[in-house]
A protein has these predicted regions:
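Long, solvent-exposed extracytoplasmic domains/loops
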Residues: 57-131
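Ligand-binding pocket scaffold of soluble enzyme catalytic domains
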Residues: 112-127, 142-143, 168, 174, ...
Length: 193
């Protein structure tokens, strides 16, 4: 073996080490991005599930209020009908009927909106819609994290193989997929598109 051959082998080895180091560093960065994407996807699904439950609870409470409100309206209407059927009712009984009708109507009206405790139908509907909006946002985020995880996992495999096989094309393919995974991760958090 001549000195020139030895020098060429050393240069090839140094170039190979440089490519391996670059691939290893890229794998490390992509593994970190993969962990962040996985965390984001997990949190998005938890949030979507939680907000869906809260929206369902708010709608159920709304329906219960609506049923109670309807019951009071029906009771008031029934008492009004009884009052109309009995024009000769004594004054005390008539006053009691009118008082009860007024109470029922006030309660039914109060159920429409209760800003003091935020449990009126209007407030419950607004709360349910807000939970739905948050749920929908989380549902829009989740697929981006899934895309990111897939792209990043494949990129890491390609980069690992590029080290073993010393194939630059695999490094570049892994880098492109890794970049796509990174962009998908960022979009999962911020929903740019």
């Amino acid at each position: 073996m001549e000195a020139q051959d030895t020098t060429e082998l050393m240069e090839q080895k140094a170039h190979g080490d440089k490519n391996q180091n670059r691939s290893a560093l890229t794998i490390s960065i992509l593994a970190m991005v993969l962990a962040i994407a996985s965390l984001g996807g997990s949190n998005a699904m938890k949030e979507a599930t939680q907000e869906n439950i809260l929206a369902a609870n708010a709608y159920a409470f709304y329906q219960a209020k609506n049923i109670r409100q309807t019951s009071f309206k029906l009771a008031a209407a029934d008492l009004e009908l009884q009052l109309a059927r009995e024009p000769n009712m004594n004054a005390t009984a008539k006053a009691m009927f009118e008082k009860k009708i007024e109470d029922y109507k006030k309660t039914a009206d109060r159920y429409e909106s209760e800003p003091e405790n935020k449990e009126g139908k209007k407030e419950l509907m607004a709360r349910a819609k807000a939970h739905e909006a948050t749920r929908d946002h989380a549902m829009q985020q989740d697929p981006w994290f899934d895309y990111a995880e897939g792209a990043l996992q494949i990129a890491i495999v390609l980069l690992s193989v590029s080290i073993v096989a010393s194939m630059p094309v695999l490094y570049w393919a892994g880098t492109v997929l890794g970049t796509m995974g990174f962009v998908s991760t960022v979009n999962g958090y911020f929903l740019f598109f």
